[in-house]
Amino acid sequence: MSEATWWYRGGTSKHDLHYRREAEVNTTLEELLLYFIFLINLCILTFGMVNPHMYYLNKVMSSLFVDTSLPDDERSSFRSIRSITEFWKFMEGPLIDGLYWDSWYGNKQLYSVKNSSRIYYENVLLGIPRVRQLRVRNNTCKVYPAFQSLVSDCYSKYTVENEDFSDFGLKRNPEWTHTPSSRTAPWHWGFVGVYRDGGYIVTLSKSKSETKAKFVDLRLNNWISRGTRAVFIDFSLYNANVNLFCIIRLLAEFPATGGLLTSWQFYSVKLLRYVSYYDYFIASCEVIFCIFLFVFIIQELRKVNEFKSAYFRSVWNWLEMLLLLLCFLAVSFYAYCNMQSFLLLGQLLKNTDSYPDFYFLAYWHIYYNNVIAITIFFAWIKIFKFISFNETMSQLSSTLSRCMKDIVGFAIMFFIIFSAYAQLGFLVFGSQVDDFSTFQNSIFAQFRIVLGDFNFAGIQQANWILGPIYFITFIFFVFFVLLNMFLAIINDTYSEVKADYSIGRRPDFELGKIIQKSCFNVLEKLRLKKAQAKEEKKMQTTDLAQRARRDGFDESEIQEAEQMKRWKERLEKKYYSTEIQDDYQPVTQQEFRELFLYAVELEKELHYVSLKLNQLMRKLH
């Protein structure tokens, strides 16, 4: 084999390079097919956990416990209460009426006291509800000396350091004594504080009258006082019609400024996983998912062992590792939630007169849903790894990589100005406008300004001079100047990339053309394409030769043209596409000689045409 047949960089022969190319194509197609099967299985698994009834169950429970009007005040509900008096009205009215459904139409008895309540006649109240209070100690804040004679008591905001652990009030019942928090229980993030488990717990009864009497007793003995900072109402429901649990938490916060803030959480989750035939089909998809996870982990370990440190230089490999990590976390959360659900349901069946802490399960189940949602997001993003062989996607990736430095520099300048305006808005309007009440809210408010969703009247009313100045200058510098600079950077770089591609720069191979070429090869093997191509080629050659004879060319010129055509066809056959080719395709000595002779003949023809044009121009003059 001559030396010219070896690739100068790696000494790769023509045959080896072709074999490597075909192997890379086959590997890519196999990996794409396998990944699509995994993605379809993941979609079935993910959407199989979501039930449209979840929204409607949350909606109906929200309307019952959050939007029901208070007694003697149709304009107020749990959503809008702002005082302790209104809170007790809610506890003794809409809450009790919503929890205890003891009669059917016409006052027909619906259930006995030993059984659970059926909310809306379809949702079983699991166990008994629980009311929990968190308090802070007196004298937990510092009072200015001049006001110490006027202020004898001082209750600060809720923190773990300020929390009150001592008994208070009557001190004879559990609701007046402190219950330690569980280390594994999740914390709750409210409007004005972050609250942990434990506190002063009131366990309700299955009897509506007993529960109402207990609420009246707590109200008369000031169970909620100045030291109260949060009251939680927790209970859980189960709807067998749709096999869904609804875990409900109503929260009333009593900030140190006075007043009352309410919030709520409704979690509809499917804790009993395998009930119907469709559930068992989802279970089979879960098994397949675990098999895929095991196979992908083995593949990535082999790649790491083969490429060593070079493996970590690819962005797609980092995405692959992130995807595997998320899949592993999803499997771990799923196993933990199922195990805890089994244990908790067993305890509930043994003792129906206790409070079942399903909020703990809902908390971890929501984390599982979030992890699986992020997993499927990155799983779809990974498709770009395969379609990046397309010319358009290659141009997009080249554009982003080429303008990355400019984008980073622009981002630094943008966030400096953006942060400056956010601090200005927070300091000027924070005490009067809800959108600027915190620094985080100020940042989101500015993004809303960019999107055109903003209440200008609010900042104008807060400060009629600085409000319009802030708004106009922010729109001018951020919206008209900076965002257009960003678009100009992207547009200019994309134009450069388009120009590079127009003069011959292409991706190594395009997936669409590879699939098209594979289909053509199959058709040729089936003798559906090959015969037709030969027929057209023969007819085209015959027509050209006959036309040349009619135009007066002699046989030597015709034979020379046919020889040049054969050389051209041989080169085109080897380099079948300018869009799918290697940057270092090997050329043999014979091919180089034919290419050189072809170029010489083209130069002669060009010179001949130039002389003819000169003669024609002289005749015209």
From Swiss-Prot:
For this protein, the parts annotated as crossing the membrane are 32-52, 278-298, 315-335, 361-381, 407-427, 469-489
Extracellular compartment ranges equal 53-277, 336-360, 428-468
Q: Which Pfam families match?
A: PKD_channel, Polycystin_dom
List all disulphide bridges recorded for this chain: none
Glycan-linked positions: 115, 138
Q: Which residues form a coiled coil?
A: 521-551
Q: Which residues lie on this side of the membrane: Cytoplasmic?
A: 1-31, 299-314, 382-406, 490-621
- A GO CC term attached to the entry: membrane
Q: What is the annotated localization of this protein?
A: Membrane
In terms of InterPro entries, this protein maps to: PKD1_2_channel, PKD_2, Polycystin, Polycystin_dom
Q: Which GO terms describe its biological process?
A: monoatomic ion transmembrane transport
**GO molecular function per UniProt:** calcium ion binding
State which tissues express it.
Expressed only in testis and heart.
Membrane topology term reads: Multi-pass membrane protein
Q: Which UniProt keywords apply?
A: Coiled coil, Glycoprotein, Ion channel, Ion transport, Membrane, Transmembrane, Transmembrane helix, Transport
Free-text function comment from the UniProt entry: Exhibits a lower single conductance but no spontaneous channel activity. May function as a regulator of calcium channels or a channel component involving Ca2(+) homeostasis.
Subunit structure, as described in the record: Interacts with TRPC1 and TRPC5.
Q: Name the family the entry cites.
A: Belongs to the polycystin family.
**What name does this protein carry?**
Polycystin-2-like protein 2
Q: Which organism is it from?
A: Mus musculus
Q: Which gene encodes it?
A: Pkd2l2
